[in-house]
Amino acid sequence: MFYLLEYLPADWSVVPIENMVPLKAADILSRSSIFLSFCDIEGFGLPPLEAAISGAVVVGYTGQGAREYFKKPNLIAVQNGDFRNFTLKVADAIKAVDAGLLDTEGFQEGRALLVKKYGRENEQRQLEAFVKRVEMAF
């Protein structure tokens, strides 16, 4: 994290959400412009997805399962362990956010696609379809 400090503008701050209760973490995510993903060997990296759906640019590691949804401009992948490139991509993301990235049509379209594929409504539809298939099997 100390690598990042030289690139961090004075009006920006880093707020760790590790070990926070879910409601507090959700509150932080809803007000965040950038989320740093430190997913390592996770099956499906849920925190980066939650951050992207919340409207933040996500920069960092994909873990294993998050590769399928790490797409620019909303999510910017970094090779696991590449601290220098991680820092540079975060610095680029800060500049992009300051230049208005979060308000661009492309960013909003990317967010909408994530919500459509991974949001609660789709999850509910898939669960209902699963229950119907199970019921039909008996």
Model regions and ranges:
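Short alpha-helical segment that forms part of, or immediately flanks, the ligand-binding pocket
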Residues: 26, 49-53, 67-68
